[in-house]
């Protein structure tokens, strides 16, 4: 997924361990999860990919048996549900990135949710600090990313580029999916 999932683990001196995916959902394969758990395992990060929720029944059952905390990465599945329950409601906490390349974006930033009052207070403490304010470099980067998005990725621009590509393909100037 993203370095933002792994870096906090590494910053704490822990070692991230990856579990292979299910080919139909691109989510963690719960059948392989238990084999990756050791006595050092503290957290399972369940990433819901491309709008497909993980098998949260299996993941939370494995975690509960071992006393392991589950945190959900909901960045790519904003609004998705698993068995009638919205993603982000299964673990101790969940987070949603609103970075420019996510399905739901504010450019930068994100959201964390939890049903744990102590953890909620710690998260609020982080938000009250200067850690949540973008630096001048980040503001400049965001401005540049927005300009690139508007120029090259914006739907009208993309449609124009596709039409030009199709035209050039028909004329034999390029080889592509329309040839």
PLM features: what roles do these ranges have?
Residues 78-83, 93-179:
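Active-site region of PLP-dependent enzymes
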Residues 1-81:
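PLP-dependent aminotransferase-like
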Residues 85-88:
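Short glycine-biased active-site loop of nucleotidyltransferases that positions the nucleotide triphosphate
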Residues 2-5, 60, 91, 107, ...:
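Hydrophobic alpha-helical segments
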Residues 39-40, 66, 90, 107, ...:
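Structured helix-beta-strand junction loops
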